[in-house]
Amino acid sequence: MKKSELKIGLALSGGGIRAAIYHLGVLKYLAENNLLEQVTHISSVSGASMCVGLLYAKNNMSFPTSNEYLTTILPTLKEQILNVNLEQKAIIEAIFKFKFNKKANAIALALSKHWGIRGGFCDISKKPLWSVVCTSYETGKHFRFSQDIVGDWAFGYIKDSNFPLADAIAASAAFPFLIGTYEIDTKPFEWCDKSGAKIEPKSDKLHLWDGGVYDNFGLEPIYQMENNGMYSDDVNFCILSNAGKSISFQSKKTITRIVDVTTDQISILRARAFRDFIFRNKNGYYLKMGRDFSEVVRRAKQDMSLADKYKNDFLSVEECQKVANYPTTLKNPTEQDFDLILRQGYESIIYNKLVFDFIEP
């Protein structure tokens, strides 16, 4: 596909502050190649939603140009992430404001007060479309916040809602057991079905979980698996940036393990379907945190001489594994860890460009 014809969708996974930084590295590559201007749709989950929300907050509620991102926004975001322990701030808000109830709502308050994420979806630029993905406890479906839609098909949609960005982001990051649900009072809003007809909400309260429970990639607003795969109308090339941790060996019995196993299997199935779709159509990249260049070459069944050619240019196997093992947390990282994770996100898209050159000049 020619570069000038690209309508890029970004599906950005969850994974706490690690995911936020990894995705910033992906955006850095796009900016260096003047491709941010061709991003038409961003779909985000959990830590990725925090990343995108911070990006808008630090750029006057507009999506940055490639030049703005490189010269101003990325350095500003780095400083913010390094200097603010968001996890600590959220705990303080949970103790003093919510008495340890509604911890997801405490995250929203911390995002607003300490990261400066304020305003609602009507305040951000119309392009690209930004979909913040959550999971509805009541319906079991993916619940979406964006500039043009709030809701899910099973519960209904909010009409003319300028939903606060910080609250949508916090709902997207409300992991079960650890944080709990984000609660929405449905009564103040006017609800409608898909056709726009007015309906009454099915309950007075709606509870939203981390979008990763349903789809940790945030793929569904951009890519659907029906009919051998299809993109939404506003996208013809999708970059799936997966900064989630793979499931690992665990002998200790915990109730959260069933969530880990279920979400891991869902992610594997979604990844297989997406990879098959983009390989057939040459219209996307799948980036996986923790994979070094030689592993990408090997999995693609390419000549390993390609890996040897660049072995001194990219992060080592050990460095990539360090990124993969970085904990899922909202604590501020060290500058060394920030730079390492950022570089892995940046290099991951270069790996794919070298192995699968789907974008023509």
Cite the ranges covered by each PLM segment.
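Structural recognition of the beta-strand scaffold that forms the well-ordered cores
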Residues: G9-A11, H41-S44, S131-V133, H207, ...
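Extended, Lys/Arg-enriched charged tracts that mediate electrostatic binding to polyanionic substrates
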Residues: N105-C122, K127-P128
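Flexible loop/turn segments at secondary-structure boundaries
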Residues: I17-A20, S49-V52, T139-K141, D215-F217, ...
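Patatin-like phospholipase
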Residues: K3-A11, G16-I107, S146-Q147
